[in-house]
Amino acid sequence: MRIVFDIGGSVLVPEDPDVEFIKAIAYELIKISEDHEVAVVVGGGKVARKYIKAAKTFTPNETFKDYIGIHITRANAMLLIAALGEKAYPFVIQDFRKAWEVIQLKKIPIMGGTHPGHTTDAVSALLAEYLQADLLVVVTNVDGVYDSDPRKNPNARKLDRITPEQLVEIAMEAESKAGGSGVVDALAAKFIQRGRIRTYIVGKKDAYHLFDVVRGKHSGTVVEP
């Protein structure tokens, strides 16, 4: 299979780099790459949001602030490259065609953000579409898709299996609320829908066992076209 992994920045670097987690997922990714083609997109997480918030003091320019976030995602990506060692391409990939070339070299391409205006969730969905990936695995700080925000509603129900259309609906509803955000943003959900991409959305606990996740053994949500 060809698999794209979307690793959330808040999972990789919650406050400081989670070194043990980075070691664990690097081990899992190397093991998976022995039998599958693998590409990874890394997010910016809380660190990126802190920098963007600070930048608001100095500039109203949203595109400029997006670029700050992109640089943070690439710093996080470099951490994972270091952990993967020789198995990873040694530089952060910045376009999809290069990611394709790196896969042909039997290396793992690692990406961060690419352009202002969309998140690394969207980058991973577009990359999966471009590569015609068999599977997209989204690792986030929530252990799946819920019918409402589990961080605010203790009665929220996790959805084991949904369609891309349902994912779009849930993501758009989450973003319509003040300060709201879903486990996958609406633009990424629309790309998943457009590309008809089979997607697993899992939490950090499952991510320690990515080898099992790609075989369908996880407690997250399956998005099935």
Swiss-Prot record:
- Record GO terms (molecular function): ATP binding; UMP kinase activity
Q: Which residues are noted in the entry as ATP-binding?
A: 9-10, 45, 49, 140-141, 146, 149
| InterPro entries the record matches | AceGlu_kinase-like_sf, Asp/Glu/Uridylate_kinase, Uridylate_kinase, Uridylate_kinase_arch/spir
What is its EC class? transferase
Return one Gene Ontology term, BP aspect: UDP biosynthetic process
Known EC number: 2.7.4.22
A Pfam family found in this protein is: AA_kinase
Q: Which residues cross the membrane?
A: none
Q: Which UniProt keywords apply?
A: ATP-binding, Cytoplasm, Kinase, Nucleotide-binding, Pyrimidine biosynthesis, Transferase
Q: Which pathway is this protein assigned to?
A: Pyrimidine metabolism; CTP biosynthesis via de novo pathway; UDP from UMP (UMPK route): step 1/1
Q: Among its keywords, does the record have Cytoplasm?
A: yes
Cell location? Cytoplasm
Describe the protein's quaternary organization and the partners it interacts with. Homohexamer.
Q: What does this protein do?
A: Catalyzes the reversible phosphorylation of UMP to UDP.
Family as reported in the entry's similarity comment: Belongs to the UMP kinase family.
Name this protein carries in UniProt: Uridylate kinase
Species of provenance: Thermococcus gammatolerans (strain DSM 15229 / JCM 11827 / EJ3)
Q: What is the lineage of its organism?
A: Archaea, Methanobacteriati, Methanobacteriota, Thermococci, Thermococcales
